[in-house]
Amino acid sequence: IDKRLIKEKKYALYKPMGFDGVQFHDDDVVPGIDDLTPAQITKQCAKVKKMLDNNGLTPEFVAPRLWFAPQTVDGGYTANSAKDRRYALDRTLRTIDVAREIGCGAIVLWLAREGSYIRESKNARIAYQRILETINAMLAHDKDIEIWIEPKPNEPTDAAYVPTIGHAVALAYASSDPKRVKGLIETAHALLAGLDASDEMAFALAHDKLGSVHLNDQNGLKYDQDKNFGTANLRGAFNQVRVLEEAGYGSKGEFIGLDVKAMRTQKGKGVTSHLTGSREIFMHLVEKVRTWDRKLEQQMIDARDYEALELAVMKHIMGVR
């Protein structure tokens, strides 16, 4: 079977579903990237770029997949082994080159195994310094690339470094070029940290540090579920859309990303239902946010009638009077 043909058929699905962009891991673009020469990588990137162009799709970002390789079992950038840290950095710089080859201007750092299961196994202070050094090396490697840090508090490590957007923003300000370092907020990751996703987004937006979002949902403090957006907490989803809309998110070309997984193995058209369903919920919530009575809201705020405000919000979301 021609794998390139399979990939092109997959890309052909996106536009009809209403999606304009694609998010990649480096080895999605270049399978077996560790074993290829720069010339081979460039050749493969050209093939992928052509497929994207043929289907009118924009590559939003590329992320280095650093949690599968044996060199990253204890983290890449924060590994105790200098050799393993070198591998992680080399792979990351190569990912920047891949992004550039396919016409992409952003790299996402989901720090995955950068953390520990046992606190005493790493020096956390030095680990954070090493993450910052990595970010600065990335910025130096390409003078235009943006770096979007995706926080997560746990999984696959018990205690991950950079668990919240506050940590990511702090690293951005400490970097050699703060304007090019931002965050990517995933709903479920914020919830797993015990935080409100809309407040995390608001914090990043207040600092002009929201590069992108991964909208999904999470049913309690357990493994990262990547549930369809709004299916566990519809009001929470409404508030995420409300915060993004109020800040004008998207007006500078930012994407709304969905990081959702199918409930189970599917065949045929069912393989994309989680994507179309989440998009539909999102679009309905955009309409709910845009039709919300702001004058009524302000009246209730001025009167400090928060019971009435909460009821009005819920009735609006439910579509009842």
Question: Where are these predicted regions, by residue range?
Answer:
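Short, contiguous strand/loop micro-motifs
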Residues: 1, 35-36, 79-83, 121-122, ...
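Histidine-acidic metal/acid-base catalytic patches
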Residues: 1-5, 12-18, 97, 133-137, ...
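N-terminal pre-domain/capping segments
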Residues: 1-100, 279-321
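Active-site-proximal loop/turn and secondary-structure-junction residues that shape catalytic pockets
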Residues: 26-30, 63-68, 111-115, 151-155, ...
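Short secondary-structure transition/capping segments
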Residues: 34-37, 72-74, 119-122, 224-226, ...
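Aromatic- and acidic-residue-enriched segments that line the glycan-binding/catalytic groove
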Residues: 37-39, 125-126, 274
